[in-house]
Amino acid sequence: MITQVTPRALLAPLCSPVGGALEGFVKEHSWGIFTEGEAFAGAEGRLLKWGTLAFGWLILHYLCGLNECLSLMNRNEYEIMAPVGSYESLMAAINAGADSVYFGIEGLNMRSKSANNFTTEDLYRIAAICREHGVKSYLTVNTIIYDEDLELMRRIIDAAKDAGVSSIIAADVAPMLYARSIGVEVHLSTQLNITNVEALRFYAQFADVVVLARELNMDQVAAIHRAILEEPILGPGGQPIRIEMFAHGALCMAVSGKCYLSLHEHGKSANRGSCSQVCRRSYEVRDKETGIELEVDNEYIMSPKDLKTIHFLNKMLDSGVRVLKIEGRARGPEYVDAVVRAYREAVDSYLAGTFDEARVEQWDKHLGEVFNRGFWDGYYLGQRLGEWTSSYGSSATKQKVYVAKTNKYFSKIGVGEFAVESGELRVGDEILITGQTTGLVRFTIEEIRVEMDPVERAVKGQVCSIAVPEKVRPGDRVYIFTDRKVAQ
């Protein structure tokens, strides 16, 4: 009986969606399968060579079942990319099932002034954390680049290569060219507004993954995907271009995000990472000659609702989208956790053939609990006009309220000790615990103890003990996740 085979080690190369990578791996590696401590096949009699790949599939079928292997192979074909603006969000993304994360460091990224940003030193730590967890790391270098930026651009990309970042995301030819010249993989940003096959053919010389314009509908995306496979249109890696598209989060009112409102109003360019969210304000529309205010549907005439695609995710994947990008580098870990977890479950459900309305309804509920401005389908299903939010700020059905910090964690019994610093904690409260290493832990309190005695609540100034489902750490912050009233 075969007793010493690791199924995941076998699955990794054999279930790769990339034929070239599969062939290279099999040609390069020996495969030893052992029985009862005795070599069944070793250095002198390798069972699996390039010419006997089919035998490997028989072994996989024996070990884990053909359906599971095919499911894992298919899952490797799809990627959920999560936004990261803090270490809390990074760990939340990883723990929720993200396949990759994208982030920026100081300067030359589209959130350099409007969201949390990491330093060059953080770059090495983030890349190491991602490698440790088997998650790809993408660095955004996606602003307009001027001549005076070129030296900084090269330093950033050099640091990305040195740190082992998986790829950069670019929207300007300068970083594309430089990254390729030093062997750094490039993904192309939605800022390029790629809407047709001719543009894709041109940009294929730079990148293996391309974000198509979010103004396209799914029929147009499917046509581009067919062209990629039929020609085929190959990236620098020699494989067909992979299509990436935004799946969830805030949308810009301008075409592919090329907005000039901030520059016009405040002298700060959104295309240089300094968006001041001018579009999110309420406005009155008046006739300049008469002073009469014109009646419009709502005051937020330039603030789009957020994109949500989970209810037609199957159509996106069927159309050829392979990388699902989630917007939200300025959002907290609770947002990242909820959105990544929902889309992870949705993709897995699609692959398992269990994607249905009941599950969509449950995912919708969880997505509505965290930051959003209301939802719409974007332009993906053929809608030509945008949908605008009716209120300022978030329409989330829940809000987090800070109440305590973590003092200790007792790993043997799975209990945390917490100092209540504001308000109170009650049995039945849903709470969030966040920290740079912890990421986010979300659960409902079943029991509280103060000085070993069970109580219904712990108030400001008290130290309490609560059973927690995952490890937490000293200094982690504790929030109540409670219902909120949404403006109508």
Kindly label every feature range from the protein language model.
Residues M1-L14:
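Extreme N-terminal basic, low-complexity initiation segments
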Residues Q4, H29, H61-Y62:
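Low-complexity, intrinsically disordered or signal/transmembrane-proximal segments
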Residues L72-V84, S89-A96, S100-S112, Y124-A127, ...:
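Surface-exposed amphipathic alpha-helical tracts and adjacent flexible/coil segments at the periphery
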Residues M153-S189:
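Well-ordered mid-protein domain cores that form the structural environment of catalytic cofactors
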